[in-house]
Amino acid sequence: PVNLISIDELQDDQYVVPVSGMGAPTVSLEKLPSEIELTNPLQELERAFGKKADVIIPIEVGGINSLYPVGAAAKLHLPILDADAIGRAFPEAQMETFHLHGLEPEQVAVGDEKGNVALFKPINAYWSEYMSRALTVQMGGSASVSDYFLAGKDVKGSVVNGTLLLAREIGEILMHQEDYDDVFKALLDRLNGFELYDGKVTAVTRETKQGFNFGTAQIEGLNNYRGKTFSLEFQNETLVAKEGDEILASVPDLIVALDIESAFPITSERLQYGSRVKVVSFPCDPQWRTPIGIETAGPHYFGYDVDYIPVEELQGKEK
């Protein structure tokens, strides 16, 4: 078992280190991490800083990166913080709330399943991304990263709190659907989300390059959305949801394709022809709606010539 601690239990002088995976999710479906891959980067940072980590934190609460740090915490017998540095998942390393608060990585360690470990000193979070990504590509397209070594006092106020318990709560809803008249409504209500459309995936184009999965899913409307065509565009995570050329939701808000039968999420690497989905969107943490948050992870950064508009405004309603 892993001990989960709250932000209130974190001491100012405790050292907090993230553990995360980097790379294209399609690669990690076949190239599984080893035990040493999860722990080597953290231990390399301990040697570099001459200090021991006291607490592990997830960089993001989305996908496999919500579980990698749990595995590392179990192996190293360290507690894990009920918080993360995104409040969702993002594809690039500078897209962390630490960066939004002026905390830049001093040293970064990247490791693979074979035991290779690289340590470098980036000048800022963007260079941390560039260099980590290059190493990840050379390590086969997926690797593990520890990119900060922070005192508890710096972590407080620069993370998204309570996200692991929130993830467990969402899991409980999905695992006990018999308790709800409408599980989709339960999920949307809990996360202040919006239904965008129901549809069937008619085509998926996907390319793995530069350490990412890039692609587009074309979707034909179902149920109340028959006769309409939609699309999802992704770089590991979904960036925009469209009806024709109209944007229905965009980063930094969260866009999720839910299996229309099971209500479980379908990640971008698992979307395929014939998938029947309910596409929904949830507002991001308020830290991402600041000017630096939008600059770091808004639609302009990903090459879209549109300004960020919160999903609740795009959908014309407040929750």
Mark where each language-model region is.
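Oxyanion-binding "anion nests"
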Residues: 168-221
